[in-house]
């Protein structure tokens, strides 16, 4: 059988991915030639599901035999990945079957009773929920709703996140709910909201096949989004005019394709962005008509601090960080801005000349000019991609705003092949954390708890009395850790994340709070992670296709899957855990008498009755479950619906969808998603939207409007004047190196799943310290030698790697964070972007010495 060119490219991408992980791939599988079917093959049932890993949203076919997932393969009908998977995707069938899978609740006990210093003992779900409910009720009585908190996930299904938002913000009346997406996507959210007044990318992956240039800012797509990278590679190699520019603080695998490769000093991306804006203006490449019609100019607050504790010297000196000043009043607001003119903006960026920015950043003048010309040339369609390099940044919101500035100045936005695109790291950081609104300040569909109209709208949809949802922003992720340490947060439920490994400054801020005698920590997880082992109660969780789910990917694509197999032992989904836990609370336990008086019908009811058996969520009978899914799986059911007697997922989804329909976040009817490979919202009249804000593509832009940034009432986007500022902590004489943390191709985040896949674990069994050979030589170190890396906060032992995939410049070291045996986040600083509250994991000062 002769392969066509696309098959060849797929085979090459697969082979490269496999080779990187040291795994052999059978040629027939790589080139798409099907092996002859056997009797065993016939017995395997196949069904669609989105991949469990990153936010790309690849789809796979899941093979089930005798109640177990036995195989997965790329879904050839999936528009995102077109049958191709990365190396992690090819081993999805093994992520649920680690030998140490948790199958029963575990509670710390001594002498038969709960004791924070006790050992883990298996208990029943009833006993687990009894102790949980007792701790929650005690805290609600003594501390009120601010004494409890939940740390969720961009890996929650859409309805798990929605159930959590209802339970916390409506049931417990606490906004202390935040997702681990705070660590990865919060700066993207605030960047979108400040510039456009509405969240999530205006473009889609279809841009790749229509663009002339790709610019990567702090994004190693070759390893972190390899399927999208394979599409960019195809575009670049098939079209000689296409260019790729890659900017990073160190050289990684994405540099292999780069026409323009730039290594810049940490934090100086801000200066480079302002230079590009200056170049566009001084060379008269501004799209004047577009700017006049569609843009407002603003100057942002600048002395905003670094999100450290209020007592830190950097926060005491800051004048606009929002912390209480000497008079007890907030010192400004880091999110503030004032209107300016185009001329004032032009003057502001004029100081960022090529020569000055070259000196600041270390990028040559020639490289800077070549990059700026890509953006400035009206004939070149450009897509900018970024991930954690921008977002995990003490000026992450600014970085997002500033890349939008460039696209808005040139009008290269909201059209095929042109646009800025924030890539996502988790499978539903967009669909669940952002769209559902599981952040401490958000409600569904971009609404916020501080807006009385938004609260009222949510209360109407949820059937709640006015005033139920609190108006004060809750604790964000880093603030939750600090509050636990300080004894202000007493009860804490952590699900579908591993913050004891992934969070910043573990020794200084996270572990002390979890082991604080005043706190009670619950972790829901499939495996005994670092977080689970530090908890007081561990709840075994179902994962991926052990439940019915939905994810929303980076291009606004919502994808649904059916439950394929049962979870082992007594493991249960996060959705079941939250709904079941809600039964333990009468409304009198959580609401004030005044609030209950506004709706007497709720008296004596449980939170389950009020939130989930409310006439809307329980609207759809079990017959719908069979009707929607019967042609795919005979006698289909799912565990949650079977437990509660109604189609739980459909009820939650349709209630949630009320928030977005008619408000620019329209979702299709629930049943439709079971038939298709996802749809990109807004979905209006059955049609998905590929490009937002532009007439002819977006149903919310009327005929004759051309471009309309309807997130803002005036239909305009904002360009912000924002300066380059240094990092919160920089190398000095003692701690003389920058530390950057991140990921590798073979492992995902903290390795909870990938390190339990034997092939992936063998490929990269432990984390290493990537160091420049000259830096190693100057310290008397050799490749493979054990060293101690230390910051002001902690130290760990690692082996030095002076070769390999990551080539760091002198003065910087890189360490991935997947290895629970080498907790690099003991060293990181808990500084955040003061606007987004997202942690900067890319910059702190360390030293390296022989162990």
From Swiss-Prot:
Q: What is its EC number?
A: 1.9.6.1
Recorded catalytic activity of this chain's protein: 2 Fe(II)-[cytochrome] + nitrate + 2 H(+) = 2 Fe(III)-[cytochrome] + nitrite + H2O
Subcellular location per UniProt equals: Periplasm
Task: Say which enzyme class the record assigns.
Answer: oxidoreductase
| Gene3D superfamilies for the chain | 2.40.40.20, 3.30.200.210, 3.40.50.740, Dimethylsulfoxide Reductase, domain 2 (3.40.228.10)
* Disordered as annotated region, ranges: 317-338
Q: Name one GO cellular component term.
A: periplasmic space
Q: Which residues bind [4Fe-4S] cluster?
A: 51, 54, 58, 86
Alphabetized, the UniProt keywords read: 4Fe-4S, Electron transport, Iron, Iron-sulfur, Metal-binding, Molybdenum, Nitrate assimilation, Oxidoreductase, Periplasm, Signal, Transport
The record describes its post-translational modification as: Predicted to be exported by the Tat system. The position of the signal peptide cleavage has not been experimentally proven.
Residues that bind Mo-bis(molybdopterin guanine dinucleotide), according to the entry?
Answer: 88, 155, 180, 184, 217-224, 248-252, 267-269, 388, 392, 498, 524-525, 547, 574, 741-750, 825, 842
Coiled coil feature spans: none
Amino-acid positions noted as binding substrate in the UniProt annotation, renumbered to this chain: 817
Q: Which residues form the 4Fe-4S Mo/W bis-MGD-type domain?
A: 44-100
Give the family, as the similarity comment puts it.
Belongs to the prokaryotic molybdopterin-containing oxidoreductase family. NasA/NapA/NarB subfamily.
Function (record text): Catalytic subunit of the periplasmic nitrate reductase complex NapAB. Receives electrons from NapB and catalyzes the reduction of nitrate to nitrite.
Q: What is this protein called?
A: Periplasmic nitrate reductase
Q: What gene name does this entry carry?
A: napA
């Amino acid at each position: 059988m002769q392969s066509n060119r696309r098959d060849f490219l797929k085979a090459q991408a697969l082979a490269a991915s496999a080779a990187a992980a040291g795994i052999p791939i059978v040629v027939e599988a790589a080139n798409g030639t099907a092996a002859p079917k056997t009797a065993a093959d016939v017995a395997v049932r196949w069904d669609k599901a989105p991949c469990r890993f990153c936010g790309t949203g690849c789809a796979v076919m899941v093979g089930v035999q005798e109640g177990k997932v036995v195989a997965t393969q790329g879904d050839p009908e999936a528009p995102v990945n077109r049958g191709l998977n990365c190396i992690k995707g090819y081993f999805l069938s093994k992520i649920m079957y680690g030998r140490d899978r948790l199958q029963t609740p575990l509670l710390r006990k001594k002498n038969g009773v709960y004791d924070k210093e006790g050992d883990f003992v298996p208990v029943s779900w009833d006993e687990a929920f009894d102790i949980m409910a007792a701790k929650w009720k005690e805290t609600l009585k003594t501390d009120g709703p601010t004494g409890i908190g939940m740390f969720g996930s961009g890996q929650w299904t859409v309805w798990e996140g929605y159930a959590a938002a209802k339970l916390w913000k409506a049931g417990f009346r606490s906004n202390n709910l935040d997702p681990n997406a705070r660590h990865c996507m919060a700066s993207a959210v605030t960047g979108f909201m400040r510039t456009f007044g509405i969240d999530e990318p205006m473009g889609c992956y279809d841009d790749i096949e229509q663009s002339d240039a790709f610019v990567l800012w702090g994004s190693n797509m070759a390893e972190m989004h390899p399927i999208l990278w394979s599409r960019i590679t195809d575009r670049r190699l098939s079209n000689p005019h296409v260019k790729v520019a890659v900017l990073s603080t160190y050289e990684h695998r994405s540099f292999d394709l780069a026409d323009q490769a730039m290594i810049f000093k940490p934090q100086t991306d801000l200066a480079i962005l302002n230079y590009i804006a200056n170049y566009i203006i001084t060379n008269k490449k501004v799209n004047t008509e577009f700017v006049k019609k569609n843009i407002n100019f603003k100057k942002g607050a600048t002395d905003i601090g670094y999100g450290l504790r209020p007592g830190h010297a950097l926060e005491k000196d800051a004048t606009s960080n929002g912390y209480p000043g000497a008079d007890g009043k907030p010192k400004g607001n880091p999110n503030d801005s004032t209107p300016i003119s185009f001329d004032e903006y032009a003057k502001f960026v004029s100081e960022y000349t090529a020569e000055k920015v070259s000196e600041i950043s270390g990028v040559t003048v020639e490289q800077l000019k070549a990059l700026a010309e890509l953006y400035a040339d009206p004939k070149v369609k450009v897509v900018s991609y970024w991930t954690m390099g921008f977002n995990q940044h003490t000026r992450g919101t600014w970085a997002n705003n500033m890349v939008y500035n460039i696209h808005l100045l040139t009008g290269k936005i909201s059209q095929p092949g042109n646009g800025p695109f924030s890539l996502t790291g988790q499978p539903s950081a967009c669909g669940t954390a952002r769209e559902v609104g599981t952040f401490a300040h958000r409600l569904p569909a971009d609404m916020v708890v501080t807006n009385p109209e938004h609260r009222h709208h949510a209360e109407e949809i949820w059937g709640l009395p006015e005033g139920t949802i609190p108006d004060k922003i809750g604790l964000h992720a880093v603030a939750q850790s600090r509050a636990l340490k300080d004894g202000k947060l007493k009860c804490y439920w952590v699900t579908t994340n591993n913050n004891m490994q992934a969070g910043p400054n573990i020794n200084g801020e996270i572990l002390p709070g979890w082991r604080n005698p005043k706190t009670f920590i619950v972790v829901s997880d499939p495996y005994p992670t670092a977080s689970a082992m530090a908890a007081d109660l561990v709840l075994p969780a179902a994962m991926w296709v052990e439940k019915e789910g939905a994810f929303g990917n980076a291009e606004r694509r919502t994808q649904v899957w059916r439950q394929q197999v049962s979870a082992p032992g007594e493991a249960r989904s996060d959705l079941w855990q939250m709904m079941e836990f809600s039964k333990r609370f009468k409304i009198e336990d959580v609401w004030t008498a005044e609030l209950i008086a506004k709706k007497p019908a709720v008296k004596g009811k449980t939170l389950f009755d009020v939130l989930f058996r409310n006439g809307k969520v329980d609207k759809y009978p079990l017959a719908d479950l069979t009707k929607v899914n019967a042609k795919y799986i005979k006698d289909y059911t799912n565990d949650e619906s079977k437990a509660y007697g109604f189609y739980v997922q459909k009820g939650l989804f349709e209630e949630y969808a009320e928030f977005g329909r008619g408000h620019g976040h329209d979702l299709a009817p629930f049943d439709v998603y079971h038939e298709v490979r996802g749809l990109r919202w807004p979905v209006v009249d059955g049609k998905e939207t590929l490009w937002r804000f532009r007439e002819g593509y977006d149903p919310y832009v009327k005929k004759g409007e051309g471009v309309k940034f309807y997130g803002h009432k005036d239909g305009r986007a904002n360009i912000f004047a924002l300066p380059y500022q240094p990092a919160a902590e920089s190398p000095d004489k003692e701690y003389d190196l920058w530390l950057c943390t991140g990921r590798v191709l073979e492992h995902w985040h903290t390795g909870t799943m990938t390190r339990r896949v034997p092939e992936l674990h063998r490929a990269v069994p432990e984390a290493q310290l990537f160091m420049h050979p000259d830096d190693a030589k100057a310290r008397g170190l050799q490749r493979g030698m054990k060293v101690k890396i230390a910051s002001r906060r902690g130290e760990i032992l690692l082996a030095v790697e002076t070769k390999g995939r990551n080539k760091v410049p002198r003065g910087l070291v890189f360490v991935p964070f997947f290895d629970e045996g080498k907790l690099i986040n003991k060293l990181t600083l808990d500084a955040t972007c003061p606007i987004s509250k997202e942690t900067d994991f890319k910059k702190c000062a360390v030293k390296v010495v022989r162990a």
